[in-house]
């Protein structure tokens, strides 16, 4: 039943409608025409307000302690996750800033060939809160436009791989560096002799050996650039071939077969990567010489073939270490499958055991010596220092030194065969020479045909202490950003790991001692 007030309102409305209907047609037309004009004006005002101020969701301010997200342009989560991971590496951002500054100083005209480095630098600085922006979501379509200028066919509506994009960016930056004018070097005699007064005469220089190699400024400063060593030893005569050096921008590690009841760790993947393998039917020059010396007639001896043992090591560790865990496998029918095993990793990573050392090199007995590399990021040490004592040496007694909370190097298998490993223990990072800190993790959810990339990364340091490293972690999925715990990060199924070189406690003490002197 309606209340008395509602009944009175209904009665008044009925009376007004009856009076309107009793009026003439001309009066009703004028009133309806005025209503149309009023409605049109109201609609125009509403549209103008929407155009000027926009919807409320577009004006969201970024919450304190978080970083901007990135809008998904179709299927660009692979790019968004990689950019968030790179922005969490201060050494890479600083190198980009120094590279663009040096390029601007050398160039006189417009910087038409520096699109990628400047675009990437502006994006990473905005994502690391170094640029003044209050927007909660940023647009990274400018990066795709620049990469298309480098003839990369990258569609924002097709699913791509974050690791492939990482190498696209590093190789494109190298192309940009190649277009940069070379810095005149003392050994570049030809450039130094290009003087006007020396035009009539041609000055030549004769040398018995090969010219001294000129330094490559970009490669020496590239934070993700490292070197692998390949060592081959004959099993018959034990002759060692010359060490071969290859460059890398990321370590792509296969995941070994898991043993039931024992977790897989990052150390297992690293050891599987450097494990020795036998290479059969290889010509050994030393065995051929020995066989030739043994003949009395001096007749020609056929090339002696033998089995070699090949092993990889890390010749030069970069400032920023990108580790790619290969989760692609193939079934017996040739179908691609994704491996979903959880690979345990820690916040800190010791790489001493995987570092290549010259034969006969003795580690320091007074602790490692830390040398500061000019131009490197704070707390990032890029000098080649001696490995810490105590790690297992070839032919040395096996000691129970545990790496990264996984297992002793002496207990790891010489060949990739499934064996039982001890339970994880707390590692000792204090005296490590090659110590890295986790900065970001890229995770892929889904299968080999479809999925989604998300990123765990450290929050940028505070403005009061910009050289510090934040302990607050963030979970980022395109434009969604929230806080996360370290335990959540370490429990994720990592696809890409971004580590950055830091000084251990012993190295920091050594640097402070030398500064006091």
UniProtKB/Swiss-Prot annotation:
The chain crosses the membrane at residues 36-56. It is found in: Mitochondrion outer membrane. The active site is at residues 77, 452. Residues 1-35 are mitochondrial intermembrane. The keyword Membrane applies. It is an enzyme of class 3 (hydrolase). Residues 68-502 form the USP domain. One of its GO terms (cellular component) is mitochondrial outer membrane. Residues 57-517 are cytoplasmic. Inhibited by the diterpenoid derivative 15-oxospiramilactone (S3). One of its GO terms (molecular function) is cysteine-type deubiquitinase activity. Its EC number is 3.4.19.12. This is Ubiquitin carboxyl-terminal hydrolase 30. It comes from Mus musculus (Mouse).
